[in-house]
Amino acid sequence: MMSKLKTLIRNKFRYINQIPQIAHYIQNDYKSPKVNLGQIQSAANKYKKGIKNLADVEFQVFSQFGDDGIIQWLINELPIPNKTFIEFGVENYKEANTRFLLINNYWSGLVIDGSIENVNSIKSEQIYNFYDLQASCSFITKSNINELITSARFDKEIGILSVDIDGNDYWILKEINRVQPVIIICEYNSLFGYEHPYTINYKDDFVRGNDYPFSFYGSSLRSAIDLTEKKGYGFIGCNSAGNNAYFIKNDYIKYLSIPIVSAKEGYVFSSFTEAWDKEGTPLRGMDKIRAIHHLPVINTDTGEIERVDAEAIINSLQEAKKMKRF
């Protein structure tokens, strides 16, 4: 009896001692089965014919929504010479647009976040040693973005630039002149609609949710399209979640089966909610837009300060049948 008890205790301690090893494999998700599933889906998308919409190729591995699939399809279709990316606003990089690209395709990249805790977390991961990744801690502003990009020592033409800083996205993208990405992924705020050229006013230390509602940030799709057109890019659509817009350098559009589309054609109203009422209940449909009514924005056509006209945006989206629910 005592012998059996000793054996039982010994076995339990053996399992306890394996916990750090198990945790190690869970943390280092580059070995995760979901990477293999992403590889299978990416291979399947190569054989799809007649792709006319980015939604047709979406899948998710590490991206917040279906952007991993869109990115994989684009890099398989486009003859991108330099396999490099820059992504900022990555937090701890567990959920990001370029993580699967790094692990699956061995691209080289620079990621930037304003939190030292997040950057230290990235640097402590195995992927920081196993792949060609640089992580920089900096709160991005118009005055430092080009210097931060230059520090990566990439060629001027890079593969992907992913912009998602929940605030000054338009102003930072406008300022960038040290690289010419083949693909630009830029977050937009669908609550501004597709017709209005709106962005929040620039503020060096803007932090989402500090001075205004949490859902008040970034720029409209229209403003992002106008800006990238001036930089030599065509708009090809948005992800199904309604938060990321995709732009392709004009020289590369010919390699894709999907055409350049207008803001109205490519606009997607966000499926998620980032606005709540006083009781903490999530706002849906038109109520999300009303939550930012009359807040100050910059008209990127005129440079003048305007106020968000929620009802005008709602009417526009209803007429275009762009809202799933009212």
Regions found by a protein language model. Name each.
Residues 7-43:
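N-terminal auxiliary segments of SAM/dcSAM-dependent transferases
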Residues 127-130, 152, 179, 202-204, ...:
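Short, hinge-like loop/turn segments at secondary-structure boundaries
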Residues 28-79, 83-86, 94, 148-149, ...:
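Rossmann-like AdoMet/SAM-dependent catalytic core
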Residues 104-105, 179-180, 231:
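Short, structured coil segments at secondary-structure junctions
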Residues 181-192:
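Conserved beta-strand signature within the Rossmann-like core of class I S-adenosyl-L-methionine
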Residues 55-163, 190-193, 276-281, 285-288:
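SAM cofactor-binding core of SAM-dependent methyltransferases
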Residues 167-180:
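A short, conserved alpha-helix within the catalytic core of class I
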Residues 160, 183-185, 244-248:
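Conserved hydrophobic/aromatic beta-strand scaffold that supports enzyme active sites
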